[in-house]
């Protein structure tokens, strides 16, 4: 029989390696993502916190700023205090924008895992300036949202139609859940 202590240690070490990267949306009422260049590894969580109501988080291709691509991530319109989390599954660049009104064309853009050369956040912002109104994806997708109020399980309360099936736990909550599951198997 495999030593359960070894399995537990390996499982918890993998979870502990993942991190949560915090991004503030509309900090101080501005049309900003702070930071606007986000470095995240595979299995990290990028966690967006809304500082002011009336924004969203959308993604699209570099060469079509302010427009969604197929299977874009999309938070839906969020209010002050709402949160949206995205689990990073690869290190390809993810170009972000706010699709509300002309927020994108006014510079409300960001990138997860910017390339080391070539397409820059400055070039994306400049191209977005001529894009007019932003376009939202057709549905909430590729993330989980919550009110920021923890449930008894420690995760944000689900508020989007698909949030319950894709809800991501914070590192601490995941460690507690995994530890409890392994102890239950012993």
Curated annotation (Swiss-Prot):
Compositionally biased region (Low complexity): 143-160
Source organism, top-level taxon: Eukaryota
Subcellular localization: Cell membrane; Secreted
Cofactor(s) needed by this chain: Cu cation
Recorded topology in the membrane: Lipid-anchor; GPI-anchor
Note describing how the cofactor binds: Binds 1 copper ion per subunit.
Propeptide boundaries: 154-186
Signal peptide range in chain numbering: 1-18
Disulphide-bridged cysteine pairs: 66-104
Main subcellular location of this protein, as a coarse class: membrane
Glycan-bearing residues: 87, 142
GO molecular function per UniProt: metal ion binding
GPI-anchor amidated glycine: lipidated positions: 153
Region (Disordered) residue spans: 130-160
Keywords, ordered alphabetically: Cell membrane, Copper, Disulfide bond, Electron transport, Glycoprotein, GPI-anchor, Lipoprotein, Membrane, Metal-binding, Secreted, Signal, Transport
Keyword ATP-binding in record: no
Gene3D superfamilies cross-referenced by the UniProt entry: Cupredoxins - blue copper proteins
Binding-site positions, Cu cation: 55, 98, 103
GO cellular component: extracellular region; plasma membrane; side of membrane
Function text: Probable electron transfer copper protein that serves as a direct electron donor.
Family recorded in the similarity comment: Belongs to the multicopper oxidase family.
PANTHER family for this protein: CUPREDOXIN, SERINE-RICH PROTEIN, PUTATIVE-RELATED-RELATED
Protein name (record): Probable GPI-anchored cupredoxin ARB_05732-1
């Amino acid at each position: 029989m495999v030593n359960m202590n070894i399995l537990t240690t390996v499982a918890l070490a993998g979870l502990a390696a993942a991190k949560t990267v915090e991004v503030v949306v509309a900090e101080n009422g501005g049309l900003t993502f702070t930071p606007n260049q986000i470095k995240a590894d595979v299995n990290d969580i990028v966690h967006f916190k809304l500082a002011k109501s009336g924004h969203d988080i959308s993604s699209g291709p570099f060469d079509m700023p302010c427009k969604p691509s197929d299977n874009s991530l999309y938070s839906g319109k969020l209010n002050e205090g709402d949160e949206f989390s995205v689990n990073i599954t690869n290190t390809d660049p993810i170009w972000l924008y706010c699709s509300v009104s002309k927020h994108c064309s006014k510079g409300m853009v960001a990138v997860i895992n910017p390339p080391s050369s070539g397409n820059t956040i400055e070039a994306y912002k400049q191209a977005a300036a001529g894009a007019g109104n932003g376009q939202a994806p057709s549905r909430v997708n590729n993330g989980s949202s919550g009110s920021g109020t923890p449930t008894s399980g420690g995760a944000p309360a689900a508020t989007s139609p698909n949030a319950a099936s894709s809800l991501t736990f914070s590192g601490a909550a995941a460690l507690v859940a995994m530890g409890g599951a392994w102890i239950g198997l012993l």
